[in-house]
A protein has these predicted regions:
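Amphipathic, interaction-prone secondary-structure segments
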Residues: 41-72, 153-196
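Alpha-helix initiation/capping motif
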Residues: 49, 89-90, 124, 215
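Hydrophobic, ordered structural segments
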Residues: 65-112
Length: 237
């Protein structure tokens, strides 16, 4: 696989909109999609979906169901009733839509995203599209990486709601991509990462306490991402 071109992050005119949109999506992932999925299946792992991210399809009382985020909308796919599209407004409204209290938890992790049920969830359409495209790019790279190393029994690619990143693992090494970090520390720009479960000391390839990261501005094609993941696998093995 080669030559997969990807729009530069400069398509987002204001980085602040990327940060606020990412924060809103993190809230929805942690406090709505994951708790709803956990009560139905006992699992929390989400997926990259067309237009954004969402639950894997699952069956509740014999009915196929999935909730996902597509751009500015929360989409409920209920087999037989079709899809219903709802504007993203607040955590309280999103939770009520799926029949959850706004303070719902999974019992698997402690949510760290904003939890005010009445605060507006600020979603910018350009930033939402940028995040969706980044997840598509990361998913493409991870699936090719998994295919190359099928003999090592890689895990499936999942979007982890507590971190809001897309990742898989090979042995005791995580490989993934984040749309950026929350809070005042970390990386504002989307980035790829390699995270050994027992991180090596910082130095050389290992440029983060958890392992290694490569910012979006240094990545042009899927081949670039694959080269980074391959370097990480070799360095950690």
């Amino acid at each position: 696989m080669s030559g997969y071109d990807f729009p530069m992050l400069s398509t987002v005119a204001d980085v602040a909109t990327l940060v606020s949109t990412r924060a809103a999506f993190h809230t929805l992932a942690e406090r709505v999609l994951a708790p709803d999925l956990q009560r139905a299946t006992g699992r929390i792992g989400l997926r990259r979906t067309a237009g954004g991210f969402g639950q894997p399809e699952h069956v509740v009382d014999g009915v196929r169901r999935r909730i996902r985020v597509d751009g500015m909308f929360l989409v409920v796919d209920h087999d037989g009733d079709g899809e219903s599209w709802h504007d993203i407004t607040t955590l309280g409204a999103a939770a009520a839509l799926v029949g959850l209290p706004p303070d719902a938890e999974t019992g698997v992790f402690v949510a760290t995203s904003a939890g005010d049920p009445d605060a507006p969830l600020a979603v910018d359409p350009v930033a939402a599209a940028t995040i969706a495209e980044w997840f598509r790019f990361v998913d493409t790279a991870l699936e090719e990486f998994r295919h190359r190393h099928a003999a090592l029994h890689p895990s499936v690619v999942q979007l982890w709601p507590e971190h809001f990143d897309l990742a898989c693992s090979i042995g005791e090494i995580n490989f993934g991509g984040s749309p950026g970090d929350a809070g005042d520390s970390g990386r504002v720009e989307p980035y790829l990462y390699v995270g050994p479960w027992s991180p090596p000391p910082v130095g050389g390839f290992w440029n983060e306490p958890y392992g290694a990261a490569l910012e979006r501005s240094a990545v042009t094609t899927v081949d670039d991402a694959l080269e980074f993941f391959e370097r990480g696998l070799a360095a950690a093995s």
